[in-house]
């Protein structure tokens, strides 16, 4: 978990690269926004994607539980253009390691209870704003004025109310100030050790 622009995706990528190939399934929380196909487009466009009510928590928890029990799942996909779920799904096979990535990955208790290791990526507000501006102006073509208004009116208040408080549930807090190689190595060692112990228990 961690605020928008905190560097979650980078941290996840580094963890995946540090672990054995094909041992990790990454589940993006963004795929589990509510299906709003029953609503008109003008209503869907008003969706606050940074509020907990935007997510179908029960489906996310159900699919994580199924992956943990060795079952494959059909992960939903979401379109920010139509602001609703797409008919296509992504087939996800169970893996030794399952990573849930998202701003509120630690928000829902049912989901937290399925996690063996909870990580929060901590980055200062100014740095997060700069990263969001850089990402959304370059990659998504959003006007700067719109991004600043969105940060002030949506991102910051939602972060302060719903995202930042979930830090209390984290087992590890990573200050994302650049090189976090030692933290990644620590997590790699912990995760691989945990997987080994779980496999030993299953063999008994």
List each model region and its residues.
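Conserved lysine of the Walker
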Residues: 8
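Post-Walker A helix-loop "phosphate-sensing" segment adjacent to the P-loop in P-loop NTPases
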Residues: 16-25
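ATP-dependent NMP and nucleoside kinases share a basic, alpha-helical "lid"
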Residues: 86-140
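NTP-dependent small-molecule kinase module
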Residues: 93-94, 134-138, 156-204
């Amino acid at each position: 978990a961690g605020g928008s622009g905190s560097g979650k995706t980078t941290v996840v990528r580094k963890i995946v690269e540090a672990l054995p190939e094909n041992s990790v399934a990454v589940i993006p929380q963004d795929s589990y926004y509510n299906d709003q196909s029953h609503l008109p487009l003008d209503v869907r466009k008003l969706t606050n994607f940074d509020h907990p009510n935007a997510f179908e928590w029960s489906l996310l928890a159900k699919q994580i539980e199924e992956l943990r029990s060795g079952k494959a799942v059909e992960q939903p996909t979401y379109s920010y253009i139509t602001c609703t779920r797409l008919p296509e799904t992504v087939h996800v096979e169970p893996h030794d390691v399952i990573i849930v990535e998202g701003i509120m990955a630690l928000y829902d208790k049912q989901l937290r209870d399925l996690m063996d290791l909870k990580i929060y990526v901590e980055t200062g507000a100014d740095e997060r704003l700069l990263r969001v501006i850089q990402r959304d102006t370059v990659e998504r073509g959003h006007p700067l004025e719109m991004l600043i208004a969105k940060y002030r009116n949506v991102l910051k208040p939602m972060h302060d109310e719903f995202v930042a408080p979930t830090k209390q549930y984290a087992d590890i807090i990573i200050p994302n100030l650049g090189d976090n190689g030692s933290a990644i190595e620590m997590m790699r060692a912990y995760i691989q050790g945990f997987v080994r112990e779980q496999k030993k228990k299953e063999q008994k």
